[in-house]
Amino acid sequence: MRLRSAVRSSCPAMGFTLIELMVVVAIATILFSIAIPSYMSYIRQSRRTEAKTAVLDLAGREERFLSTNPTAYTDVPANLGYTGFGAGNPVGSGYYYLTVCSPATVACAPNPPATPSYSIMATPVATQSQANDAQCTSFSVDSTGQQFATGTGGTAYCWGN
């Protein structure tokens, strides 16, 4: 009997108590509640950057098109080197659609272009999470280089951010 009690006393108890485990879970919850919104904001901003880059790339292609066809711009994306363009084919990671608008097009309704010119608009895909971005809903640029954005953030915030 004495031998058993000597063995038990020489081996300390191992493991975590319930309180220690609850403290760790509480700390992890606090860290996640801070980290996840920050991460989502970062992701949202990177997708905005992708949309702005696509709009500016397409505007550059329009200007190159005009240099070889000096009479008019085009609203046909295939003429600009884009294939698979349209409502069923979002650009980049798949969060935005690009639209090329001529003066006769009403798709770029907030800022329709004047004649002869163009306007390019990136709008979020309705089924993607970027459609919930209320600050910067859509991005557009016209043939004069003027940039526009819709959403609560406004043009200066959305194009500067």
Show which residues each predicted segment covers:
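Residues at secondary-structure transition points
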Residues: 13, 45-49, 53, 109-113, ...
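Periplasmic/extracellular, small/polar-rich flexible segments of pilin-like filament-forming proteins
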Residues: 2, 67-161
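Alpha-helix exit/C-cap motif
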Residues: 45-49, 57-79
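N-terminal leader/signal peptides at the extreme start of proteins
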Residues: 1-16
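Internal alpha-helical transmembrane segments of multi-pass membrane proteins, especially GPCRs
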Residues: 14, 19-23, 44
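Alpha-helical hydrophobic helix detector
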Residues: 21-38
